[in-house]
Amino acid sequence: MLESHLIIHFLLAVIQFLLGTFTNGIIVVVNGIDLIKHRKMAPLDLLLSCLAVSRIFLQLFIFYVNVIVIFFIEFIMCSENCAILLFINELELWLATWLGVFYCAKVASVPHPLFIWLKMKISKLVPWMILGSLLYVSMTCVFHSKYAGFMVPYFLRNFFSQNATIQKEDTPAIQIFSFVAEFLVPLLIFLVAVLLLIFSLGRHTRQMRNTVAGSRVPGRGAPISALLSILSFVILYFSHCMIKVFLSSLKFHVRSFILPFFILVIGIYPSGHSLILILGNXKLKQNAKKFLLHSKCCQ
């Protein structure tokens, strides 16, 4: 018999999985229908679709880990499985980073020649960002494949220390490279982009308040809404990365009480941020409402 807290954890994991699959599925389906209708896809829609697909697979993996932890199933640590897990995790992280860069380039105002060039070219750069991410992540996986003991993604190596046999001990050089390549580089790019965006939106909000003080202007709350959306993105992204780093620095047995909690927290990001994206995008929000109404009518 499962203990009560494990039953609650399993129910939360199922809800999280269904929510993440639904929200990311809505993004993929809506943009896919637009692609079929118009035979082209906007750069932002392309980036969101790729991000949503990677998050669906990431959500599947997180649910799989939840099942392992709850039911104490032995984790099969073969190089093929670990390479896939590493690829999905790193690709999602990079695509989310480029989404932050895209928002920054489109919305922020920075009087610098490089930023002005990026602002003009960002739409054309989106496909290259996606291809570059695929290439970078593939190279990371190739590097890991040369070290049998390092095939597990950095944030998962210590999860199943009692279940897995690590053939080699991590050297400091490998640990540093893994941390920099898998976390630090995309995290720094993301933080620079969103900080520029937050400062720009904050400055714009203050200017609007000073200009239209005491009057009601349509769309006045749009910058504040965008700022809150970006802040929630930052909090989810940063907490997701920090928890992975924290778990990488400690060893947990699968029966540890704190491990299921951290896995649930990690799963909030790919589902929670996609929900925020839908609520902040008029096209996605309308189609999500239509889908829910259609589902109710069919019952």
From Swiss-Prot:
The chain crosses the membrane at residues 10-30, 56-76, 82-102, 125-145, 179-199, 223-243, 258-278. It comes from the Eukaryota. GO terms for molecular function: bitter taste receptor activity; G protein-coupled receptor activity. Its main location: membrane. It is found in: Membrane. It is a multi-pass membrane protein. The keyword Glycoprotein applies. Glycans are attached at residue 163. The keyword Glycoprotein applies. Keywords: G-protein coupled receptor, Glycoprotein, Membrane, Receptor, Sensory transduction, Taste, Transducer, Transmembrane, Transmembrane helix. Pfam families: TAS2R (PF05296). Belongs to the G-protein coupled receptor T2R family. This is Taste receptor type 2 member 1. It comes from Pongo pygmaeus.
